[in-house]
């Protein structure tokens, strides 16, 4: 296990780096996206417990907005030289605020209509979000390939979260979770 490096124009405690890496979770490797999704669970569950689906919706919107800004600061300020840590500027691995937004979006169906958060439901949400984020079914794959910059970084995970949320809604409807 190692750590990703920050781009030269950011410091560990700069607001853009803290937000983009979700307080450093994205610096862990391998599997930065999994670490970011896991780090999103605790605050997501606290938000869900305190404010329910509406809190998660607002949290998702806030994470998306701040994530878009932080991702743009990360990507736009990076030098143009080749650097495998930046993943060719497309979707740098250390940026995991997109996973946070997608994970919180995925949790929403578990809190609708007064439903209780169960360990099985949370585990299913985590597994489904990671599945759709990694396998990238359409339109997740489209967003990942066609959109550049901060929008591309953020939107593919939102779409993966929507896929996971749809499956969770169906699983809940059929009493599976």
Labelled PLM ranges:
Residues 1-89, 93, 100-177:
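Hydrophobic alpha-helical transmembrane segments
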């Amino acid at each position: 296990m190692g750590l990703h490096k920050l781009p030269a124009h950011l410091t560990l405690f700069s607001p853009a780096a803290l937000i983009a890496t979700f307080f450093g979770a994205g610096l862990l490797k391998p599997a930065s996206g999994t670490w970011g999704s896991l780090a999103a669970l605790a605050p997501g569950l606290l938000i869900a417990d305190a404010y329910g689906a509406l809190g998660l919706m607002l949290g998702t919107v806030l994470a998306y907005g701040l994530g878009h800004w932080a991702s743009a600061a990360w990507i736009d300020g990076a030098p143009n030289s080749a650097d495998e840590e930046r993943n060719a500027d497309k979707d740098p691995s250390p940026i995991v605020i997109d996973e946070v937004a997608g994970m919180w979006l995925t949790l929403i169906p578990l809190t609708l209509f007064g439903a209780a958060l169960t360990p099985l439901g949370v585990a299913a949400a985590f597994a489904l979000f990671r599945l759709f984020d990694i396998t990238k079914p359409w339109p997740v794959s489209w967003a990942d390939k066609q959109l550049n910059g901060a929008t591309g970084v953020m939107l593919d995970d939102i779409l993966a979260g929507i896929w996971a949320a749809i499956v969770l809604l169906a699983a809940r409807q059929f009493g599976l979770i």
